[in-house]
């Protein structure tokens, strides 16, 4: 059966055979074990046990069980044929070369080889550890059987490893060494011969050893052959390189690979003697730290504790925890985490051991101490590769042996190489990519460095710095910026030393720079201390390794029996060898001095004993050694004596005498020993003895000064005559240098001692004397001697007589003493010169001569730099030079700090600096910058990974930070120098500020990229900020300042070309002082930006943070004065004269000047800027485009800042202008969204208007001066746009205040009357302060402002549009109301028409609106409206008017001739024009056009009884229904762009009045009811809402009377009834109202409608007219049913005449009694617990004021007819109203509910559907009435259809009290899942206030009809008064709220329905802004 083959898998072309990978897995497991063992092995002795277990596990792995893991010898011993057995195995295990890189072919041999080799080394390391840690003697330990066995195991491992790789020369050497330890000389010799005969053919030529291992092996073989005396073998050609050459000493010490093992093959065997030595107990001398210093201190402690005992002492070294060095080899291929391109055996580590196998001799110990440390050995270059065909195995494994295939073998390989192996091929490419990456990382840094140093070089050269050394140093740095090896270009020695101190950081060396700054000691002792050492090379010497050779010394001492005396002598003798060659550490020097002082006697005795036993050979080494020892001890004791005799020493006299004795004793001993030698003139020991002798003579008390001086002169002469070189004693402070120059310094010190004694006297407090003494010594170039005129004339030969004294440099006439001082200072060290400069600077500081003090600091810096370049420094050895460098670097740091402090904080620092001084100082600072730059380069390279970072320590980090701080201070100080230089040479630098700014920016970039700006407390950033703020003429200063502010405070300016970079600086808090300094620059930047852009930029955040730092301005008396005057001015009435005076700049306020810290920013407009930001925030969202009211907080904040600005600068017109804008915007916010404030809080609106107008007046007045000459005042708004905006907005404010809804109220001030004194007499009279401004004056002034605005903005159509409107209003003003002047200049019709046509011309010139935008229609509509009104007024002929309109762009037939004859044609033409404009209004924004159309069709002033009026009204109604009113009477009026805030509510009021009038004429009671319901819910949307509501209600009531023909009852129908009879009649009328006979009764229907409108009114207006209607309806009903009532009564009751006792109700008659009781009970029950159905639905916003609700109609209707408390004989009107309500409720219940049982109630769930009740509304009678039970099925259907609308339910429930006959109404409303329920008594009574307001009663439940037969119930908390004025409260539990919306509204979508919510929000009105609107003639009557 064929195998399955997937058709969607392509078969491979080359299918490799399956390979068994079991062996590979086993090899990988073994390698893991090997790596684990290797890791444990490398961890040191503490892991040796674990490493042993790991190696055991390794050798138990499967690979060591393979046949190929056995050696040839093992196979031979096993009886196998090596050749036949091996070939097939290796054929299977080793695939073709190059094919299996990581497989068994390469990994297995390597694993076997390395496992055995490293295990053998591990065994040797364990032996080494045992030897080190053992307290027994070495020989018995190494003869132990276990050690011998371990060594044999190591030898076996080495043999197996060599069987795998016989080319390992180093392994052959180790094998030979182990064999020598095991006393196998034959194996030793064989192994050494194998090591050097690997691949060399001796028959060809003599060859050199190719590696260091072979060289060592050859040298060892030569020594062994020499021991054996095998001269024949030494003649072999391969031995020639070793026989004829010697191994260098520094390599010979590394020749023995295992020096801890004894080597018996080094000498011929001798018979061993029996060891009979008996171990004796010795004292132990423990050492805590293995160092010479600790050993000396331990000796002193031992003597102090044990005394000078004679017991033997054993020195015990500490058990160090540090890991011992282990030798191991790891093939790089076995470490996948570190892939390497190299193959083969890596270089092996050669271990250096001081100890040797045999007990070291004392000479060996000394040799180990004195010999220089050997440099790291580097293997010599290997020979060229041999012939590949050579059958001899090469030492380096070939490519094939390593398993790496050639390029041509890849295709032929059977198995593809692994990814790890293939990555080796791309190593070179990766290195190249890495180099490119590093170069890209360095490129920005190098570019910044190059820019900075090139800028510095250019500036220095231009300033005249010609020092080639300085320029060369800068050139070095520039060259390094472009080089790969940047530090390789640096040649300066000081820079190299600094680089070395970083790369080889030492904590002790770094502590010099990191230590706290110590003030210089300006005393004589300090001077003497610094004067002891002269040459800078005195400290030359390499540092002594405190632990080198100590182990050998301890082993040597412990081998014999040595007391503490012997140990101390040997200790001193061993260290004296290094006295002149190495610089001892301070601890070691102290230890040696302590040992020589405490055991001086023992050392002296030991020395004398050794001197006595030594051979008296004058040229022997022993005598020379003893002479050096004696002289060294002499010098050490002399040094101790010098310190004891120091004036500051606290040693007692006994100590001084003892020290003197020691000096004398060792001086004698040294002299005696030296005399035993053959003396040479240049013998160093002799020179040292002579110098020490003279020094001791100098120290001796009582020695004459002349004698001492002669001794030094003699010594100097001797040194001059001898050929001796300079001798440096680095460990002696008394005589550190022996040379002619040092002798000269000592002589100079003696000769100048008097001068320095006077200089450093403790009581010398005269700084002037110090200046006069030191200035000639330190600065002779600046000191001149005044020569009298006579002497000057004599010198000149008398040719030029002059009376002026001359000046001569002091260098030309110096005295011998001064010359000696100069000579002394020239040879002195740097510390002394710095000390003197410091003394001079301190003296200048005391006399407050800052500039000279600053000069001293700079000279000190120059001194340090010159010393770093001196020959003494350059030719010093490394260690002392580097120590000296750190000391000078510390001094340099202190000097730079002091200099920078004076340069930045004292303006007089540079007063006396001449050009030469300036150039030299700048040159020195440039050198310092170049030197310190190496630290920055080092950090760059370590940061990006170019160089390995040193071990990170806190001290190193602190050291680098210190260098960073020095660099920052140096650049800062250099800037101050350059600034002075540039300002002194204006001819060379025409724009010095730009050059300085570029330099600062270059430094900032260099520091910022390295995150160094924060160094030195951000001193550079602070300096740069101050400098940038000072400089005025910098290009792109915002870029420089922006980065500085971001680094300092985290502020972003958001301007400029560059983006700010993160320089790693922690932002600081911005202080007030700093913020005030920034105000000028920040304000300048803000002025460059528009406010809209400013609000989006980072600069706004910066300004806010600055203001937070500045804080609020503290009030001052001056500020309070100004603010008080401003406040009083804003409250004052508007004076007409001030308006016209403002046009000429004559209005001003009384203000005083304010001088506070905030005055400076105020003058720069800071507070104005803050106010503008706050104002622009509010203006950011256009008023008319916001959907919700805006927060006025920003407005108030802006006004506050603007007022503050005006307190400081009262003449800023723009601040007044923006303050006026704030008032304007707050006014607009008050009237834009609601009409509440217009209706109730008009005083606040008047205040806003007056404040704005007053502010505009001040802005207009102060702008006059600015407009005349803009340079007079400094204005932030330097363009004229704001000025013309001010003209326009001022005009708009004036015009708006003159029109409704403000209606000239701001200009009326009748309430502000004052008393005036009569002209004649003493009386007074009261009148207003000045005349009020008329509306004509307002329009005239506004037109003038708009004309001024047109000058600046000719393309703004609003200005000419408003001019036209003003002219039209002025034209409409009746001439009789104007004065004579205004009547003469009253605008004409042509002027009005021209103004309108000008507006249309401007609009037509504007660009066409974009697609989807409507054109500007306001001017086009306005000219149609105005022309029509002119025609209607008769001021313009019809044809002329038509001609005018026909020429307009939007005429129906533009340009055509039309003929209009009469008024009808004219109206038709105007209507055509309006319709054409409406077609252009796609968005239906222009509601004025619609209303103008309707007004043309129907005039609301016409008589409604006219038949034509009804038709006209219907036509107008149809026009309005098209786009303004919906069928549910929802008015959709949108606020257009050109409509002023507040006008919308005026228009809505006018439109509602017009619609009410139209509906009244049409007798459309249903629509009128809907209109009333709409306006009742939205009282806040209508201006004069209370009057509007009263107007609508009265119209509706009148319409009800006319519709249902309800007569006005003049006579009360109930005047003949008593109260009881009235109650009985009321019950019967209520019962009759539910019968079918009552359905067609018009009075009943009218009464229901009246009750509903009364509920809707909810006491908003006086209910008199409504009550009259209800009373009349009830009376009509009574009169209608009265006959039936009488007939029924006569049938039931006997007739009794009036007054008959039997006419009274019979109490025994149960029916009569029950009727009466029922009426009384239900009435009382209703009063107590049942809320009336007439409750208030008035919303919070619709609550009228009490006084307003009591007003009568404003339409001129008569007040309700007067009535007494009772109707007729005893029936009060409230009782009639209550009975009428009961009747209406009965009708509603009968119409809405099916019959139900009295005892229970149902939810309507029975019957399968929810039956929803109907409460009757006015709409029930729309069809003329409907029977209560008619159409019950239809009602049920309607209930189901409208159930989702959350209507109310009314249900019959049983009486809670259990009484019969009582019913209560349960009103339910579903709210989501729940139901809110309330109960009301069925026979509830309703009491309404009488016309006189005697009392009010009734719950405020407003049931509004919704759709057909629907009713809405709104919840309203209320409190009613019972009759008689007694309040009657009803519980809130019975009040139920519902939505106020109709079903039609839900269908039309005009209003959203939200069940259970509060009263609905006002109708959505789309509002737009910022323009004007047209006014109609009809507005005048408002």
Curated annotation (Swiss-Prot):
InterPro entries assigned to the protein according to its UniProt record, in alphabetical order: Hir3/CABIN1
Compositionally skewed regions (Acidic residues) per UniProt: 348-365, 1832-1847, 1885-1896, 1907-1953, 1965-1982
**One GO term of the biological process aspect:** chromatin organization
Q: Which GO terms describe its cellular component?
A: HIR complex; nucleus
Sequence ranges of Basic and acidic residues compositional bias: 1688-1705, 1743-1754, 1897-1906
Name one molecular function that GO assigns to this entry: nucleosome binding
| Compartments where found | Nucleus
Q: Where is the composition biased (Gly residues)?
A: 1801-1810
Composition skew (Polar residues), residue ranges:
377-393, 1706-1715, 1732-1742
For bias type Low complexity, the affected ranges are 1755-1765
Q: Where is this region: Disordered?
A: 333-427, 1688-1776, 1791-1982
| Membership in a protein family | Belongs to the HIR3 family.
Protein function: Has a role in a nucleosome assembly pathway that is required for the integrity of heterochromatin and proper chromosome segregation.
Q: What is this protein called?
A: Histone transcription regulator 3 homolog
Taxon lineage: Eukaryota, Fungi, Dikarya, Ascomycota, Pezizomycotina
